[in-house]
Amino acid sequence: MIISSASDYREAARRRVPPFMFHYADGGSYAEQTLARNVSDLENIALRQRVLKDMSELDTSIELFGEKLSMPTILAPVGACGMYARRGEVQAAQAADNKGVPFTLSTVSICPIEEVAPAIKRPMWFQLYVLKDRGFMKNALERAKAAGCSTLVFTVDMPTPGARYRDMHSGMSGPYKEIRRVLQGFTHPFWAYDVGIKGKPHTLGNVSTYMGRQIGLDDYIGWLTENFDPSISWKDLEWIREFWEGPMVIKGILDPEDAKDAVRFGADGIVVSNHGGRQLDGVLSSARALPPIADAVKGDIKIIADSGIRNGLDIVRMLALGADATMLGRAFVYALGAAGRQGVENMLDIFKKEMRVAMTLTSNRTIADIKPEALVDLSKL
């Protein structure tokens, strides 16, 4: 099929990847209201076109935590990303590296830190959950530091897993899930060969390395449910700082008071995020949560936004709403599932081109020029 946008990659991934993996990325929690709102709230914000300004010199690059990014985006941490393409985390990291943006490795990746880090030139970011096993957390931080990871992304909106009903229907969880996955593999032969056979081992690489035994996909949801720690508090940041001296970003902030706490406890950045609508359904979209958070802490801490970004125009919208940078999750997973590393590289090219068009026609030469005045909220008209 012809690929011209991220939505095309979604359709290509739907055809190529078996349902249990496609819907794991595509779905949200409960009735998926927040998942839908993340997208629709961005769509309801129009860009203010401005003309007759010299836009011959345009720059999409930024500097973030001492790193030069070719565009204001980071590939977000995605669990089990290695199930979308053969050794998928390596391919996605190489694509990001080639396009000049950071890749964030998930705690629950298929490929371990030690496999991904040597495959790229620029330092990757590493994402960490608060887990009951503090020994694992300490081990993961030490390994990330030894591998040269530059920034820690500390995810705080998963003290307990969200209820993702779609996963039960698709075969990721629910009754007879193993049999259903095998049958789906038969109807998706390319994926079955490329990932199912050539992409082994299908284990949680970082966890398996620490445990000294294989923690496979069948154990994935159960392991997470058993190990997420509902006692998570701001004091955990102090504990993490004992083992991590580099930049630390708190992911999962939706309230201005939490953003202020992140500043007070010494975080270097926050990610305004509702986990892509995969945790608590019914919460604010990131687009709606972002402006009051920016009003509260802009300039005191770096603000990154994710959830609902489907094209380069959405990146510009998030920047105008107050973000310093953005994270992409589903968009790159669709591209990875559809076409591997080349798909992710092409997706980033598409987003960058869309950004450049939007910046040109809103008369913003640099990322720093993008302000709230570039937007019109259609819901208020």
From Swiss-Prot:
Ranges annotated as spanning the membrane: none
Binding site for FMN: 106, 127, 155, 251, 306-330
One Pfam family of this chain: FMN_dh
Cofactors (names): FMN
Entry's Gene Ontology BP terms: aerobic respiration; lactate metabolic process
Entry EC no(s): 1.1.-.-
InterPro entries (alphabetical): Aldolase_TIM, Alpha-hydoxy_acid_DH_FMN, FMN-dep_DH, FMN_HAD, FMN_hydac_DH_AS, LldD
Reaction catalysed by this enzyme: (S)-lactate + A = pyruvate + AH2
Location within or outside the cell: Cell inner membrane
Membrane topology: Peripheral membrane protein
Primary localization class, coarse: membrane
Active site residues according to the UniProt entry: 275
Keywords (A to Z) from UniProt: Cell inner membrane, Cell membrane, Flavoprotein, FMN, Membrane, Oxidoreductase
Entry keyword Membrane: yes
Binding site for substrate: 24, 129, 164, 278
Presence of the UniProt keyword Nuclease in the record: no
Enzyme class: oxidoreductase
GO cellular component terms given for this protein: plasma membrane
MF terms (GO), sorted A to Z: FMN binding; L-lactate dehydrogenase activity
PANTHER family named in the record: L-LACTATE DEHYDROGENASE, S -2-HYDROXY-ACID OXIDASE-RELATED
Name the UniProt record assigns to this protein: L-lactate dehydrogenase
Naturally occurring in which organism (per UniProt): Haemophilus influenzae (strain PittEE)
